[in-house]
Amino acid sequence: MSQSKFALPRNGFTFKQFFVAHDRCAMKVGTDGILLGAWAPIAGVKHVLDIGAGSGLLALMLAQRTDHDVQVDAVELDEEAAAQARENALASPWSSRIEVCQADIHQWQPSQTRRYELIISNPPFFAEGVPCATSQREQARYTTTLDHASLLTCAAEHITEEGFFCVVLPVDIGNAFIERATAMGWHLRLRTDVAETELRPPHRVLLAFSPTAGECFCDRLAIRGPEQQYSEGFTALTGDFYLFM
């Protein structure tokens, strides 16, 4: 989504209600994260946990979407990214509701004994690949520090019985993630396949799992319409966030 109509800060991304600086983060604000933050179910949510928070994008989006008494905890391993996420939260309208912690999620415990109705993560995609220019980028891109089995285990330790654990992944990796999650006792409850247009195959999948079994609702979202304009579905989902939508 272009932000070129006005002179906006160049070290991040300006949304309607907040700004995300991301120049000190390995992974920048992108469509995947924005889709996930806008899509995750929030009915009945009182506590949100963002695993691998990066710049704090998801924590900020969920703070905007939820009631004034909802607490959002964001955990990020990388020191620089966690510091920037904390600064972004402090500069937002919801600074009193967002707590950013620099920690390894495997060792982290919430400041209060609680479980979360919503856990959200935009996790590393790939098991291995071409070495990255920095260890920070490698940590964000590859599952070397947070593999998917460990992520599912961590989420299970912190979620309520009726809660949802939501991720966004490439379709092929998402299908493998579903198999792994199912084998570990999770139940897929929501699935949205995301394609660039109606005529193209999906390239991303939004997934919501729960410890509790129930019907699984599946649908499809095209980002653009036949004339390359943003589709009605994409606009309805993300319109509260994109500045010029």
Curated annotation (Swiss-Prot):
It holds the Pfam family MTS. Keywords: Cytoplasm, Methyltransferase, S-adenosyl-L-methionine, Transferase, tRNA processing. GO terms for cellular component: cytoplasm. GO terms for biological process: methylation; tRNA processing. The keyword Transferase applies. The keyword Phosphoprotein does not apply. GO terms for molecular function: nucleic acid binding; tRNA (adenine-N6)-methyltransferase activity. It catalyses: adenosine(37) in tRNA1(Val) + S-adenosyl-L-methionine = N(6)-methyladenosine(37) in tRNA1(Val) + S-adenosyl-L-homocysteine + H(+). It is found in: Cytoplasm. Its EC number is 2.1.1.223. Its main location: cytoplasm. Belongs to the methyltransferase superfamily. tRNA (adenine-N(6)-)-methyltransferase family. Specifically methylates the adenine in position 37 of tRNA(1)(Val) (anticodon cmo5UAC). This is tRNA1(Val) (adenine(37)-N6)-methyltransferase.
